[in-house]
């Protein structure tokens, strides 16, 4: 019986024996087949650089306001003649240019003044100051530029041509705000233009012609030839005339008034002026 079992086991082992045999011993490769470390590192590098750059690019696409001078230079070929630093609201009004002072704001306005004088021809006297929308510092720039010219010894007049919303009233201490250029434009035959001019308490060379009472027809008023006559008269008595005009992106008044100006100074403000506003600048070139 035992012999029979042994024979059966031998037959079973013979039937299940493998047909294969080891010809040569296998050796492990020096480098793994997977994962590919170099490919993973390269992909990580590309994603690590690409995702932040793409994110920043997308943020830039959604920003519709200028941030610095580089944005301005990309959007227009009009020369950038000055960069004003941010100014905290001064304790006394909005005039930061003073005689015998040399802080950074006053030096900046001196630079602006110098550049403008280089751009003006000999007989050109009228500088028009505008912006795209309210809140960009147009009247602030116009007022301090006028003071800077007065400190140069030039007889300077600043005229409030933003007759819908006079900004000079917030810049200067004007005693009779209801009397101004609109009175003359409305009734030139019975109004003395020079009686509307007020001396400034800032400097003896600085004079102010306020906007006056807000008229019901401002656009028609500035379109009249009497404005040309008024500016011609003023040019005979003053070395420089600064026109503080309305924001050109809001109303058409400034485009009409620009006919009497020799040079247009366009004020932009970082984080306020929209990039689309530069279509107005390029149209005014």
Question: What kind of region is each of these model predictions?
Answer:
Residues 1-25, 69-71:
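Non-transmembrane alpha-helical coiled-coil
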Residues 20-41:
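Short, aromatic-rich amphipathic segments at membrane interfaces
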Residues 20-24, 81-83, 128, 207-210:
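Soluble periplasmic/extracytoplasmic beta-strand elements of cell-envelope proteins
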Residues 36-157, 161-182, 186-190, 194, ...:
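Short boundary/hinge segments that flank catalytic cores
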Residues 128-130, 210-211, 242-244, 265-269:
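Conserved beta-strand segments of the P-loop GTPase G domain that flank and frequently precede/overlap
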Residues 155, 204-207, 235-243, 253, ...:
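Loop/turn-to-beta-strand initiation segments
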Residues 211-251, 258:
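Phosphate-binding/switch loop-helix module in NTP-utilizing enzymes
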Residues 245-250, 261-278:
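Conserved Switch II/interswitch segment of TRAFAC-class P-loop GTPases
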